[in-house]
A protein has these predicted regions:
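Conserved polymerase palm-domain catalytic core
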Residues: 88, 96, 103, 144-148, ...
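Histidine-centered nuclease catalytic patch
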Residues: 181, 548-580, 588-594
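A conserved non-catalytic segment of reverse transcriptases
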Residues: 217, 223-226, 330-395, 410-411
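Non-catalytic, polymerase-adjacent accessory regions of viral genome-replication enzymes
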Residues: 1-86
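Short cysteine-rich loop/turn motifs with clustered Cys
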Residues: 527-557, 579-581
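Right-hand nucleic-acid polymerase module
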Residues: 1-2, 377-449
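Polybasic, low-complexity binding patches
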Residues: 565-573, 585-624
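Extended C-terminal regions of large enzymes
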Residues: 430-434, 440-524, 602
Length: 624
């Protein structure tokens, strides 16, 4: 089975790229390596409150979809973007000196089953503080987390969890699943237990642990304005919540692992590694099977997990033992109506929107998987809503936007659920159920139309189900092919140079100059300006946008295409990096000055055209 990282093309991983911008990658690598060796960490606040870490947190939060969502103070990332860089850094550093979190705004988000999920939205400043903490804690925790914990972790996804399930079912012949649903997990996390678990992971900075305690106990403002003061639970919606939930359940991962796969043996058996870097412990497992131990493997994605067993008897004992362990160790209860032992030769077991079963094929069993019933209902509702939006547009442009949104919904569902082996049955059935609605609501659907080059032509161009509306293509709901779920290559790791080489192309710029840029702020300029200046340096490969010469310290001008006094902004699209000589020439109006810099720069025709475009935007006449 191929792994998702076995590609010749290595894309730029945005989070790794941001870390490189602020020269923190080697620091995070060192934290990971030290944690792997079992070292403890007593002074993390200094790193969290460093200028580089704060700027990295700003950049990361700025790129999040939720950055425009206000907290109780009604402020968003836009309010911080206009602050001077130095003032912004001092503001965040002040939080670490004496932290007092603001109340969290409660928002109810509808769930597919008709119920709502409570989200806690911290203020934008508290989100920046949480991001500063997350950036430092993540490499420490990554070194301690289990290989089959897949949720909210770098370079891991639901695809890896499904691949692990399929392997355990089909290759390792574990046909019994223990399905345990933790009742209200995020609302019932014990704060004291969580702090002790962090201490056990080596996070022993007492000031940091006090800050996290205060975050957990931050008042919650309900939609009706009332305040509640939580004594347990981690608010969903916080930046740190996913990491904290993984810390809580990490103990479960290793407890299940200790019952079988990591059980010590008297004799030290040899292990080898396959092409993906996974340990092959067949000799050890053969010896363990001669004992009275129960064979079990856990696959987890956030608070959703399954334990796979070889026999019904083992599965029942594992169910009871895990239920008791969760209650005694973590203070968590399970939902009796949702928790059960399943023989997957006879019944489906649901996980992450899929339902999986084993069926006999010749002398062996193979995995058969579909979209779960809930997933089908949810998909139908999403597509139906997208169809209705196309039917009643305000104008032709609005209809085009609605069609794009419809295509985005359908393609997104295809991408996620194509891991199901029988997805080519599920989506045609879904299409059939929506056929009447489409024909009634979307009058004018036709087979005739022209596909431009791109994603839709590449993936759906051969489909006879493809339809057009006013010349715009609509992705066919029923046209989808299954794809094997691919394992994560074990060597892939954001916090080792070798692991990053598998997935990420390094910055092709002079890092010394980039560090100089980072550490030499422009006075009286906003944090947005400073952040975008560094992004531009990487995007332009460290070269002048006009002459192509290498940009060097003290010879870099960050030019506003449309001047601020003419309504320009500090946004990325309005900035360009040039040498100081070019920058002066863009704004020069005296003939003597213009001739001086033209002589110095010796621009060719193409370079002069680029320069004149910038002069025109700046309100200065073109140079003949």
């Amino acid at each position: 089975m191929l792994t998702s990282e076995q590609q010749t093309h290595k894309p730029k991983q945005s989070k790794i790229r941001y870390t490189e911008y602020y020269d923190l990658q080697s620091t995070f690598d060192r934290l990971y390596a030290d944690s792997l060796k079992g070292k403890t960490f007593h002074n993390l606040i200094g790193l969290m409150a460093s200028e580089e870490n704060i700027k990295l947190a700003y950049r990361t939060i700025k790129g999040n979809k939720g950055s425009g969502t206000p907290g109780v103070d009604k402020r968003t990332i836009k309010h911080l973007a206009s602050m001077e860089e130095e003032k912004f850094v001092r503001l965040i550093q002040k939080q670490f000196s004496w932290y007092n979190p603001r109340p969290v705004r409660r928002v109810e988000i509808p769930k597919p089953n008709g119920k709502t999920r409570p989200l806690g939205i911290p203020t934008i400043v508290d989100r920046i503080v949480q991001q500063c903490i997350l950036q430092v804690l993540e490499p420490i925790c990554e070194a301690k987390f289990h290989e089959r914990s897949n949720g909210f972790r770098p370079n891991r996804s639901t695809e890896h969890a499904i691949a692990q399930c399929c392997r355990l079912m089909q290759i390792q012949h574990l046909h019994y699943a223990v399905d345990l649903d933790v009742h209200g997990f995020f609302d019932n996390v014990n704060h004291g237990k969580l702090i002790r678990q962090m201490w056990e992971l080596g996070i022993r900075d007492k000031k940091l642990l006090c800050i996290i305690k205060q975050m957990l106990k931050a008042p919650i403002v309900l939609p009706d304005g009332k305040r509640v003061y939580p004594t347990k639970g981690t608010p969903q919606g916080g930046i740190l919540s996913p990491l904290l939930s993984n810390i809580v359940l990490n103990e479960l991962d290793w407890w299940v692992s200790s019952q079988w796969e990591n059980m010590p043996t008297h004799y030290e058996y040899k292990t080898r590694q396959n092409a993906r870097g996974t340990d092959i412990k067949s000799h050890t497992y053969r010896a363990l099977r001669r004992s009275n131990l129960k064979e079990m493997y856990l696959v987890r994605y956030a608070d959703d997990f399954k334990i796979f067993c070889r026999s019904y008897k083992d599965a029942v004992k594992t169910f009871e033992a895990t239920k008791k362990w969760l209650k005694d160790r973590l203070g968590l209860d399970i939902s009796p109506e949702k928790s059960k032992v399943i023989n997957m030769e006879q019944r489906y077991s649901e996980f992450l929107g899929f339902k999986m079963k084993l069926y006999r094929k010749g002398k062996k069993y193979v995995v058969c998987s579909h979209m779960s019933d809930k997933a089908v209902t949810h998909a139908k509702e999403k597509i139906s809503a997208a169809i209705k939006a196309i039917q009643t547009p305000a104008d032709s442009h609005s209809q085009y936007i609605a069609i794009q949104q419809y295509n985005s919904v359908v393609a997104g569902l295809h991408n996620y659920y194509r891991l199901a082996t029988r997805v080519s049955e599920d989506f045609p059935n879904l299409a059939q159920g929506l056929k009447k609605q489409m024909s009634n609501r979307l009058r004018g659907l036709t087979r005739n139309g022209k596909l431009e080059r791109g994603f839709i032509k590449e993936r759906y161009g051969k489909s006879k189900q493809l339809r057009f509306l006013n010349g715009h293509p609509l992705i066919p709901i029923g046209y989808v092919q299954t794809r094997d779920a691919q394992h994560k290559k074990k060597t892939v790791n954001r916090y080792t140079p070798e692991g990053r080489a598998e997935i990420h192309k390094n910055l092709g710029v002079n890092t010394d100059t980039m560090i100089w840029l980072m550490r030499t702020p422009v006075l009286d300029k906003s944090i947005e300006f400073a952040d975008n200046r560094i992004s531009l340096f990487a995007a332009q490969y460290g070269r002048c946008a006009i002459t192509g010469t290498e940009l060097m310290p003290y010879d870099i001008g960050c030019h506003h295409k449309v001047p601020l006094e003419n309504g320009g902004t500090d946004k990325y699209s309005n900035l360009v990096l040039v040498t100081e000589a070019v920058h002066l020439l863009i704004h020069a109006t005296l003939e003597e000055t213009i001739q001086k810099y033209l002589k110095q720069l010796q621009l060719n025709k193409k370079q002069l055209e680029k320069l004149n475009k910038l002069r025109k935007l700046a309100g200065t006449p073109a140079i003949a």
